Curated annotation (Swiss-Prot):
Component of SCF(ASK-cullin-F-box) E3 ubiquitin ligase complexes, which may mediate the ubiquitination and subsequent proteasomal degradation of target proteins. Required for brassinosteroid (BR) signal transduction. Mediates ASK7/BIN2/SK21 inactivation both by competing with substrate binding (e.g. BZR1) and by promoting its ubiquitination and subsequent proteasomal degradation. InterPro entries: F-box_BR-signaling (IPR050942), KIB1-4_b-propeller (IPR005174). The gene is KIB2. Disruption phenotype: Abolished brassinosteroid (BR)-induced ASK7/BIN2/SK21 degradation, and BR-insensitivity. Suppression of the constitutive BR-response phenotype in the dominant mutant bzr1-1D, and accumulation of phosphorylated BZR1. This is F-box protein KIB2. Interacts with ASK7/BIN2/SK21. It comes from Arabidopsis thaliana. Keywords: Brassinosteroid signaling pathway, Cytoplasm, Nucleus, Repeat, Ubl conjugation pathway.
């Protein structure tokens, strides 16, 4: 990584393009400590390129000074989020020092990821990340597959469940570039075969996986994927002997799933009857039904029209089950209505509530402790209009990434600037937490 000269620095107004092998292209102000970090990266690269004989002759590790952990921590704590996680990859010493900094460096507010629309002229394998805490944006390039013709179905930390334009699944970590292949959609294991009838579909939009959840435990190197089509549920765990999806059909013939969430080994399924059923995946091969919540019934005198509303399920920090009634009209300006209901165990009905000091991430189906955006809902228009083929840059969808305040009933933040000046057309946006809890080794 060549140092910037003064002329180049002046032309770029103290911003630069960081080019690290197979990593990120981003812009930020370059502090002195980043130069120290870059030097360490260069030294590692040079060391790797040396032959074994040259290394023994020119660089005896036992005679080289090793930075003490306190100094490494001091450097890591002053690096940007992306540089911090690049630094973890330099050596075992850097990785060990970073472990004590993870609680500081893991974000406490959700990031936003934007996925590209298909570009007919060239393959597009870039996506955009946005950190609202310091208003920094990153472009992730060279992911090694056609991202524009794939669709993100769910996320867990820094991991994303992707379905390509055929019927192939994989789990992707954007930061480490680890990809875990999953069984294809046809492999359901019990004769429920989905044929590859969408070979010429451009972006996977005709493969309508209704809902999906992803759970990844980096420390235990474990994962679970569950997807749903109508009444059919498919799931796959790490270590399953058969390379296929296990299937179960828990809903009645005239019922189907409209949303689901996952937390602490439990799958929360919201059906079209607005009933929530909970399935426990912590046991053996098959999930076990462990709880049922009655249908959401509106009491007399509710003050809004439910026609055209969407229904979502979520789980709070304390484990309470929520049903969210949502109505979003993106054009000509964002008009939203959200109502959050919680089960009232005393009356066996639902009561309308606020979130207090928590915030709701509809993409993840969970609430989190909120530092600033309290009693708010993070959502994107695409959640309610997926598979419509529209770009987030379209006039009818450009205000597609929003934060809604429950008490005031207004959209209090719109991230229009993420798409307004971009040369890339984005088809989807999601909130996620880029958490690094351990080193994933396959």
């Amino acid at each position: 990584m060549a140092p910037l000269n003064s002329q180049a620095a002046g032309e770029e107004e103290s911003n630069y393009q960081c080019r690290f092998p197979r990593f990120m292209h981003l812009s930020w102000k370059r502090p002195y400590l980043t130069r120290v970090f870059d030097l360490a990266v260069i030294q590692k690269k040079q060391k790797k390129e040396m032959s074994d004989s040259e290394e023994k002759k020119c660089n005896d590790d036992s005679k080289q000074p090793v930075l003490v952990l306190d100094l490494l921590r001091s450097i890591l704590e002053r690096l940007s989020f992306v540089d911090f996680h690049r630094g973890r990859c330099i050596s075992l010493e850097w990785y060990s020092a970073s472990e004590s900094c993870l609680a500081v460096k893991n974000p406490t507010s959700p990031w936003i990821i934007l996925f590209p629309s298909e570009n007919v002229e060239s393959k597009n394998d870039s996506c955009k990340l946005y950190n609202p805490r310091d208003h920094s944006s990153y472009i992730v390039r060279d992911l090694g597959f056609d991202l524009a013709r794939s669709r993100c179905l769910a996320s867990s930390g820094s991991w994303f469940l992707m379905l390509d334009h055929r019927t192939d699944f994989h789990i992707l970590n954007l930061f480490t570039r680890v990809r875990i292949p999953l069984p294809p959609l046809e492999s359901t294991g019990d004769g429920n075969v989905f044929k590859r009838v969408y070979e010429n579909v451009s972006d996977g939009s005709c493969i309508k996986i209704d809902n999906a959840v992803l759970w990844v435990d980096e420390k235990r190197r474990d994962y679970l994927v569950v997807w749903n089509i109508s009444r059919l549920f498919g799931y796959h765990k790490k270590g399953d002997e058969n390379y296929s999806w296990k299937v179960f059909k828990p809903l009645k013939k005239n019922d189907c799933c409209i949303d689901m969430a996952f937390k602490e080994n439990k799958l929360y399924v919201l059906s079209v009857t607005r009933k929530v059923t909970v399935y426990d995946f912590s046991g053996g091969d098959s999930p076990v039904k462990c709880a049922t919540f009655p249908s959401l019934r509106f009491r007399n005198g509710y003050s809004y029209n439910t026609q055209g509303c969407h229904y979502k399920v979520a789980v709070t920090l304390s484990g309470e089950v929520l049903i969210i009634v949502a109505k979003v009209e993106p054009y000509p300006r964002v008009e939203c209505f959200f109502a959050v209901y919680k089960m009232d165990h005393n009356s066996s009905g639902y009561e309308r509530i606020s979130l207090g000091g928590e915030a709701l991430l509809l993409d993840l189906g969970i609430t989190v402790e909120a530092n600033c955006m309290k009693n708010c809902i993070y959502f994107s228009n695409d959640q309610f209009h997926r598979y419509n083929g529209k770009s987030l840059c379209d006039d009818s969808n450009k205000n597609g990434i929003c934060v809604y305040h429950i008490r005031s009933r207004y959209v209090v933040q719109v991230f229009e600037h993420l798409t307004a000046s971009s040369k890339i057309a984005f088809k989807d946006a999601r909130s996620f937490f880029p958490i690094f809890g351990g080193k994933w080794l396959l």
